[in-house]
Amino acid sequence: MKKVLRITNPNVYAAYVNAPPLHPLVCILRYEELGLFRRSLNLYSVYGLFIQDEFVKGISYGMKTYETHGPSIIAVAPGQIGGVEDNGELITRKGWVLLWSPELTQGTAWEKKMEGYGFFSYYSSNSLEMTPT
């Protein structure tokens, strides 16, 4: 059975990567400011944007594998599972992560708009690719 990190609030992930809590509803991390940490397969109860120059190959997202090429953004939403199972290896990453609790947008116009953003959907298997302008 796979070990799954249950991210019930943004600071669960912060604690996992040895970062201090920022706010009860929001976590913003710059990976270059963190030490070594382990990979994780995550069950999200939060929204998130993972922004990296290069993602590791084989990131699972639901029953699929995410396709990333170069600088990309991966979006996650509550109820979704994704990541790379912990194999015991300590790693570093380059980039940013923003996680926020659904409570932050509950009852707001932004909550309604987010429902229409396809990149938070399980049906998406491609990252949002960033290209220089």
Regions found by a protein language model. Name each.
Residues V4-I7, E85-T133:
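A hydrophobic/aromatic-rich effector-binding and dimerization subdomain
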Residues G58-S60, V76, G82-L90:
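Short beta-strand His + acidic residue motifs that chelate non-heme Fe in jelly-roll/DSBH
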Residues M1-E67, S72:
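Generic protein-terminus/edge-of-domain signal
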Residues T68-G82, L99-W100:
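Conserved metal-binding segment of the jelly-roll/cupin
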Residues F55, P78-Q80, K94-W96:
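A generic structural signal for short beta-strands and their flanking turns/coil linkers
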